């Protein structure tokens, strides 16, 4: 049995949170857009993906994004709201916990994972990676994308 996963984010860029769910059974995001009070269905992802929405392109609208675990790695799939282009980034291991957020303060969501007390961040501002030891191996990481 598949369980829908919910997310709150500003997909339409009106400054208000939109209600959304990701339905793994059909790989579709369902969004109630607050600006126009309209419904949007966006196929993007598949069963087993972890949802990681954020403003990866810095346009003020949340982008559809998922973290997919392969046998060895973690792959990030992002659909940019600015131009509907699609990108993939291999970042992390298949056992990592995805923790996107604006860690470098540039207004764009950075790709990041948490692994046993260490944060691994791929900065959107310069493409550089940073690591931060913070937390214990069994801690649950808390990070939120900076959606403007």
Task: Describe each model-derived feature in a short phrase.
Residues 1-148:
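Trp/Gly-enriched beta-strand/coil motifs that build multi-repeat beta-propeller-like domains
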């Amino acid at each position: 049995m598949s369980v829908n996963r919910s997310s709150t984010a500003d997909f339409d860029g009106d400054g208000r949170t939109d209600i959304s769910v990701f339905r793994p059974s059909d790989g579709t995001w369902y969004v109630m857009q607050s600006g126009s009070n309209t419904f949007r269905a966006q196929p993007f992802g598949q069963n087993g993906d972890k949802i990681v929405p954020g403003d990866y392109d810095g346009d003020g609208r949340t982008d559809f994004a998922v973290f997919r675990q392969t046998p060895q790695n973690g792959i990030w799939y992002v659909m940019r709201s600015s131009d509907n282009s699609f990108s993939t980034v291999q970042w992390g291991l298949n056992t990592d916990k995805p923790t996107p957020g604006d860690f470098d303060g540039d207004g764009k969501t950075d790709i990041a994972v948490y692994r046993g007390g260490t944060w691994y961040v791929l900065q959107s501002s310069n493409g550089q990676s940073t690591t931060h030891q913070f937390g214990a191996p069994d801690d649950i990481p808390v990070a939120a994308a900076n959606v403007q």
